């Protein structure tokens, strides 16, 4: 439960309802501090929790379930899905999330969603999971209504978005940096990843992918995005009889 406790403590928006009638909800740290006797630990807790931050807690194996695509870099796919969902984009299809993000950057996303619901009688959020199949024509109607052009032109837009979408570690790090830039000064984004060891298994490529994600994220955000990882099983045990270079890879993450 340590990972969950840390995620709650470090998230500036998290509140715990009081069991006492009439009392306002409190931050988890406000409940914990009166029970901490060590003054140094108390000071460290106050300092850490005073930093504005958002916690993203997820089980990596569960979060991976449902993602579409080639799965050439499954670790990266999950890490990209999480901030997409945080911002209200569709996490299971990267090209749809990228399309939504691009509209949002131009200040057109909310207007498009309103047009979609008015034209089709259904919400965009409920329909977008079937965009590649049954709702493509519904998308075309709404897109043509909002931006002009024909419905065939609209279908070409979303097809081109799918064909041109490429997921990269640099793109992911850039998106996180962009999100942080929209937040108050000093704001941090913390990824709390549960069961990473089980998901990595004996696949060295996943281990290296995780290492690169962590390093790129820290570099792009000047340390304002941090990755916390837990595993019920020891990572060395999961990897089995690793070769020397694999053990070296592992040490870079630990």
Locate predicted features.
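Conserved nucleotide-binding/hydrolysis micro-motifs of P-loop NTPases
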Residues: 8, 62-67, 197-198, 232-237
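Beta-sheet entry/capping signal
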Residues: 1, 54-57, 187-191, 224-229, ...
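Short secondary-structure boundary/capping segments
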Residues: 3-12, 72-79, 205-211, 234-253
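Conserved helicase/translocase P-loop NTPase motor core
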Residues: 133-190, 203-206
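Sensor-1/coupling segment of RecA-like P-loop NTPase cores
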Residues: 217-244
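Conserved P-loop NTPase "ATPase switch" module shared by AAA+ and STAND
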Residues: 56-63, 184-205
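Substrate-engagement module of ASCE P-loop NTPases
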Residues: 12, 175-182, 209-226, 249-253
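P-loop NTPase motor core
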Residues: 2-129, 254
